[in-house]
Amino acid sequence: MPIITLKMAKGRSKEQKQEFVEKVTALAVDTLDVKKEWVTVIIDEYERENWATDGTLHSIKFGDE
């Protein structure tokens, strides 16, 4: 029973997230030989002010959107 977690900044549309979930689920089914019903996808979204790379907050590097 695979559990796949995506961590990303907020701002993607519901349609983008649905497309991601569909594609990653299909990939898990094909490569791991599991039933679709066994695949769980969790999307954790973060405010850009709570995420940093290279020592810089993403809200500064990329803006608040």
Report each predicted region and the residues it spans:
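A domain-level signal for the structural core that forms small-molecule/cofactor-binding pockets
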Residues: P2-E65
